[in-house]
Amino acid sequence: MENQLWHNTVRCCNQYQESPHDAEDILLLLLGLIVLVNIGINVATMMWHGLQNALDKMIDWATQKNEIQASESPPSGPPDKAQDVHIHCILDPVQVKMSRPTQYSSFSCHHFSNHHSSSLLRCVRRRRRRHRRCRRRCCNHQQRPQNYRQIPHSHSVFRNPHRSQKMSQLHRVPFFDQEDPDSYLEEEDNLPFPYPKYPRRGWGGFYQRAGLPSNVGLWGHQGGILASLPPPSLYLSPELRCMPKRVEARSELRLQSYGRHGSQSRLWGNVEAEQWASSPPPPHRLPPNPSWVPVGHSPYPSVGWMLYDSWDQRRRGTEGFERPPASVSRNARPEAQGCREHHSPQSHQQSLLGHAYGQSHRSPHPSTEPLGYSSQDPREVRRRAADWAEALPAWRPLTTSASLTVLDEASHQRTPAPSSVLVPHSSQPWPKVQAADPAPPPTMFVPLSRNPGGNANYQVYDSLELKRQVQKSRARSSSLPPASTSTLRPSLHRSQTEKLN
């Protein structure tokens, strides 16, 4: 019994002792569970952050890779290719109509500057060919007894201004006129005097209408090498031509000096002057019998001109000659001066020098040298003078037969009776010549002192200086009585100091 009670007590004690152990175990378990949960949360948090970082990195890498692939790889759609633009240009050939320009009474700046150096060379070559043709023509036409001129009166360079204006209005045709190219040529056929269909451009802006074949094929109608280009005059507008320019010309062209007050200023090349001087004059200007020409008289009549050539004067200056005085052929006939100055050696030498200079340009006959005819019969002299007057041409723009008229009263008073025997008297009345005031010597055109390149044969002409001298010569010519126009050798300057009443 006692043992049973013992056992029950021990059990109760054991039960009391086991119960706190269970509470501690439960607490430990709870603490363990809390720790485990905390660790699990932390691990889960760490894993989440790690996974989140990994996901972010993967997303960033994927986006960068896509951007790189998008930039490197071509777009998925077909690319727009650049289209080639093909431009076909068709250049039509330019049709050129050569129209005659307005003829000016004197040169201005743009007349001289119209020509380039290349056109000067072409003009020289054309004049050489024209010179050969003119020689043949003059040789063939010397036997022709009729009035024949190499340059007809209606084609003269120094023509009436009203007539030149009318002709310029008839023949002024625009270059780019799209009408019939031969429409203005039909008007030329109706004119009373012939013109070449395609005029040739000459020196100084004039058309030499001498019936020579033209070279328009170089520019237009005949399909020359420059048919597709406009003529050079299109580039020279009036504004450009009036601007000051430097015009260079070689001295082989031998530019002419300016003439006297009454002359119209012209510039001509002495290349053409040599052609005119070498070719014989027209036959109708010759006297019936040159062997009986009076003393000191040229077969060509005179009205008191003094013709100068600047190049020839420079050459004479180098040879020691003096310029022929202007009084040799002014205010009196050459034969009367030859009679008056026969006993004066110096004046006789000057008159012979002026006479030889005029003969070298105007007379190829050596038989016109001074001869003595004081022993001839006056009736024979009068009869031959009448023949002389009949042989002279009827058309006299300057009344050039005035050298055969009666001398002035002063000439009769100065010369004795033997010289009056030589005076021919015609049945018809002759016009009386009134001498004008003596004019000063011609103003020489002095080029500038510049000499580019050191070449002695190369001069520079200033267009402003040229224009100034042209205006000065115009002012002088306007102050003097009007001089009648005529056709002369274009290489020589004309100066008329006598006026016909």
Swiss-Prot record:
Its main location: membrane. The chain crosses the membrane at residues 26-46. PANTHER family: SPEM FAMILY MEMBER 2 (PTHR34834:SF2), SPERMATID MATURATION PROTEIN 1 (PTHR34834). This is Uncharacterized protein SPEM2. Keywords: Membrane, Transmembrane, Transmembrane helix. Pfam families: Spem1. GO terms for cellular component: membrane. Residues 316-384, 409-501 are annotated as: Disordered. It comes from the Eukaryota. It is found in: Membrane. Residues 476-490 have a biased composition (Low complexity). It is a single-pass membrane protein. Disulfide bonds: none annotated.
